[in-house]
């Protein structure tokens, strides 16, 4: 009986220690987790509008990737660079110059910036922390993101 109580107490301690960490959430199969969000790289090139629509169909709450720190960009680059090599992925920003966008397509605040040009839609390089403007009708790879 004493051994059972000891083992039960030990399991309770382990459970409680994990409950305050990110162990409480997990991303669906094929998605990668970072800072309580899930990300997936898709190896197909489509225009910005179709890319945003595609992301919203992948998972509830999913949109084109939004960035809120250089560390988050580094995480996404670690996922895109090995798969897509030297290319570009759509980000959840469009009509930035025409409408002075202040938020991402997922509704979060535009609180981190790394501009490198002007146009309607914004891409991120798959190999480093640079954003470039491109014609929204051009075809680029897709990274989707949602809050876990």
Curated annotation (Swiss-Prot):
Q: Which cysteines are joined by disulfide bonds?
A: 27-38, 55-144, 121-136
The reply on keyword RNA-binding is no
Which domain of life does the UniProt lineage start with?
Eukaryota
- Domain C-type lectin spans what residues? 34-145
Where is this gene product found? Secreted
- What are the alphabetically sorted keywords of the record? Disulfide bond, Hemostasis impairing toxin, Platelet aggregation activating toxin, Secreted, Signal, Toxin
> Record's PROSITE patterns?
C_TYPE_LECTIN_1, C_TYPE_LECTIN_2
The Swiss-Prot or TrEMBL record annotates one GO molecular function as:
toxin activity
Is rRNA-binding among the key words of this record?
Answer: no
Gene Ontology cellular component annotations, sorted alphabetically: extracellular region
Tissue-wise, where is it found? Expressed by the venom gland.
**Entry's InterPro entries?**
C-type_lectin-like, C-type_lectin-like/link_sf, C-type_lectin/snaclec_domain, C-type_lectin_CS, CTDL_fold
- Residues annotated as signal peptide: 1-23
What Gene3D superfamilies does the record tag this protein with?
A: Mannose-Binding Protein A, subunit A
The task this protein performs is described as:
Platelet-agglutinating factor that acts in a vWF-independent manner. Binds specifically to platelet GPIbalpha (GP1BA) to a distinct binding site from that of flavocetin-A.
Family to which the UniProt record says this protein belongs: Belongs to the snaclec family.
> Its quaternary structure?
Tetramer of heterodimers of alpha and beta subunits (alphabeta)(4); disulfide-linked.
Q: What name has this protein been given in UniProt?
A: Snaclec mucrocetin subunit beta
